[in-house]
Regions:
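Cofactor-/ligand-binding subdomain signature composed of acidic, glycine-rich
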Residues: 1-50, 163, 171-194
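Glycine-rich phosphate-binding loops that contact phosphosugars or nucleotide phosphates
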Residues: 44-193
Length: 194
């Protein structure tokens, strides 16, 4: 595709940019078909030993979190809850569980999600941030950061960042499934519907 191709609107251009954004994002994490060792080292121990995960996000990022909920539960056997970031800050303090927390934000600066991250960090919970801005506040304050390389999005609806969030969450799931010794079990029990 020519870099000079014109599009009727920004969103259409960003849709066509998704394959390149995915390649750039996957290159951050993979060495051939394996998770890069530096990333594996960074992810080691991010999860809670009780196998509980909370995902806090808003908007399209929350939708990628809902997809991750299914992946992490089905393939890793983890107990996952997905919360609107704004609601977590209102009720999170009453939660006696201590789940590992994943925050997802395209900008890494979403105020409700940042407030949730700060709240759980103060309680000493393990945190992981997935953002499209590797120097964002969330990326810098979380215990582990998984940046995206989606590039700039000018259209309001998420396109490239949403697709890259899904890819990174899938890689995280595969890493956890392997770490937990569930890769064989996951593939044996997860059969496609006819």
């Amino acid at each position: 595709m020519s870099v000079f191709k014109s599009f009727a609107h920004e969103m259409l251009r960003e849709i066509y940019e998704q394959p390149a954004a995915l390649r750039r994002t996957l290159a951050l994490y993979l060495d051939g078909n394996r998770l890069r060792q530096d990333m594996a080292d960074q992810l080691a121990g991010w999860a809670n030993p009780a196998g509980e995960v909370l995902i806090a996000a808003s908007g399209s990022s929350r939708h990628s979190g809902l997809a991750a909920e299914i992946l992490l539960e089905d393939l890793c056997g983890l107990a996952v809850d997905v919360e609107y970031s704004s609601e977590y800050s209102c009720r999170g303090g009453s939660d006696s569980r201590r789940p590992a927390v994943i925050v997802i934000s395209q900008s890494g600066e979403t105020s409700d999600t940042l407030a949730a991250l700060r709240e759980v960090s103060q309680r000493g919970e393990k945190t992981l941030a997935i953002t499209n801005a590797d120097l964002s506040t969330m990326a810098l304050e979380a215990g582990v950061s998984m940046p995206l390389a989606a590039g700039v999005e000018k259209a309001i609806p998420a396109t490239k960042s949403f697709t890259c969030q899904l890819a990174v969450l899938f890689l995280l799931t595969l890493y956890e499934a392997k770490r937990l010794g569930r890769m064989g079990a996951a593939s044996a029990t997860h059969k496609p519907k006819p």
